[in-house]
UniProtKB/Swiss-Prot annotation:
The gene is prfA. Methylated by PrmC. Methylation increases the termination efficiency of RF1. The modification N5-methylglutamine is found at Q233. This is Peptide chain release factor 1. Its main location: cytoplasm. The lineage of its organism: Bacteria, Bacillati, Bacillota, Clostridia, Eubacteriales. Keywords: Cytoplasm, Methylation, Protein biosynthesis.
Length: 356
């Protein structure tokens, strides 16, 4: 591990030098990439330096214990030795976690898609509540949210919504939300007081930049059409809606929320890049990776990941057997404790694999 850490320190020092290089400073894309990696390695270097300092202190105490000491001094140095050994072990454990393989997409913005599943109007109403839950989470973290497209119904629910959350590391937090979310409650339209079960599917994709994935112009079919609101409201006389098809995969994206065709085209391409990258990533996963993701639960869409039981005021995450109460707080975006537990579970699984 020490050799690996020394390599990290060398890389960090090289990046520090690059950040002052005029050729890097004058290239915004390269500067952003260098700064991002520099920021990521900083905590590892800081922790390793603390580890090295503790090692030196431990050596000093061992040297003192080899010399002549009265009983009281020896007892004090022995206690300090125990404390330093404990500190060294803690730092070593923390460094092992920091050195775990990272998801290369963790630092990216995130594109999320919420779709009402089984349950009719009740599913669409819960889809709207989940959308609010994520926007409230974003507000708490001061993350920027942008709606890319939304389809509502007459019941006040959402059939489907595509939105983007812009924040460094947003994907690292929200990637655990992908899957089937199940709600159990008595719908407002239910006169007999019976509990109904409905489902909503959440897809989570990292935003891909042009440098991450190439979409060739000849692979795209772009159609423009007029966009109109529900019930004929805000009817757009110009052809501003954009329907974009990626021919090799058959993936289709439709954007009509903006008045400008150019804005809808830009949004559609952004979503298409994320979906195409996700499609190829799913195809490329090995059987071992599929098994790991099923165990850890970081995005299998068919997986029933969580149940929101309103009568019992509880939320259960089935992947790790976690149950929390105060469903009102959860629906108001207080889900960091659930995300933290999922992240810790993934860390433990990765550590076990590294040490196997």
């Amino acid at each position: 591990m020490k050799q690996k850490l020394e390599g990290v320190v060398q890389r960090y020092e090289d990046l520090t030098y690059k950040l002052g290089d005029p050729s890097v400073i004058n290239n915004p894309t390269e500067y952003r990439q260098v700064a991002r990696e520099h920021n990521r390695l900083g905590p590892i270097v800081e922790k390793f330096r603390a580890y090295q300092k503790t090692e030196r202190e431990l050596d000093d105490v061992l040297e003192m214990l080899e010399g002549p000491l009265d009983p009281e001094e020896r007892a004090l140095f022995n206690q300090e030795l125990r404390d330093l050994k404990e500190k060294l072990q803690t730092l070593s454990d923390e460094l092992r976690i920091l050195l775990l393989p990272r998801d290369p997409n963790d630092d990216k913005n995130v594109i999320m898609e919420i779709r009402a599943g089984a349950g009719g109007d009740e599913a669409s109403l819960f889809a709207a509540e989940l959308f609010r839950m994520y926007t409230r989470l974003a507000e708490r973290h001061k993350w920027k949210t942008e709606v890319l497209s939304i389809s509502e119904n007459e019941a006040g629910g959402i059939k489907e919504v595509l939105f983007q959350i812009n924040a460094e590391g947003a994907y690292s937090r929200l990637k655990y939300e992908g899957g089937v979310h199940r709600v159990q409650r008595v719908p407002v339209t239910e006169s007999q007081g019976r509990i109904h079960t409905s489902t909503v599917t959440v897809a989570v994709m990292p935003e891909m930049e042009e440098v991450d994935i190439e979409i060739k112009p000849e692979d795209l079919k772009i159609e423009v059409q007029r966009a109109g609101g529900a019930g004929g409201q805000h009817v757009n006389k110009t052809e501003s809606a954009v329907r974009m098809t990626h021919l090799p995969t058959g993936i289709v994206v439709y954007c009509a929320d903006e008045r400008s065709q150019m804005q809808n085209r830009e949004k559609a391409l952004r979503v298409l890049r994320a979906r195409v990258a996700d499609y190829y990533a799913q195809q490329a996963k090995s059987e071992e990776e599929q098994l790991r993701r099923a165990q850890v639960g970081t995005g299998e869409r068919s997986e029933k990941i969580r149940t929101y039981n309103f009568p019992q005021d509880r939320v259960t995450d089935h992947r790790i057997g976690l149950t929390v109460h105060n469903i009102a707080a959860v629906m108001d975006g207080e889900i960091d404790h659930i995300i933290d537990a999922l992240a810790q579970h993934e860390q433990a699984a990765l550590l076990a694999r590294e040490e196997a």
